[in-house]
Amino acid sequence: MAEALLRRRLEERGIKARVASAGLLPGGAPATEAAIETMAADGLDISEHVSRQVSPSLLEASHLVITMTRQQLVELTVLEPAAWPRMFQIRDLVWRSEQVGPWPPSEPFADWLRAVGRDRNRSELLSAPLSDDVADPIGQSAAFYERTRRVLDDLLSRLATLV
């Protein structure tokens, strides 16, 4: 869901970026029917989506990695510690980005992202509030999927105005 929402918001702003999703579980699973229906109601077709598992090489090649939960961020940091400066939990990323302000395209994206991540410490992951997490809707009601879609769309819309 987040992949399709972010791609749409970036395209609306004329931003060319490669957006891909990957998870901690083994790949190969299609999007759930509830996710397909929720996104279709918002004009997005994710019916061809197939999950894939994240790998150290994917993390290494990514300019930005966004997780839904702090636990995912912890696990990815363990998987590829060198990618830590480019990995953020979504709410934390949006909040920090709003504090720094929009990325000036005349500067390298990596410089802006370093400013966004300034003063972050990995030890925060152990004490950070879980209330920042975006809950996984799998197995939940259609209403839960819709709430998750709205939360993600709000966060990703805000992020798209900054990158």
PLM region spans:
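Conserved active-site segments centered on acidic
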Residues: M1-S62, R70-P85, S157, T161-L162
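Short secondary-structure boundary segments
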Residues: T69-R70, R91
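Phosphate-binding/catalytic loops
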Residues: T77-V163
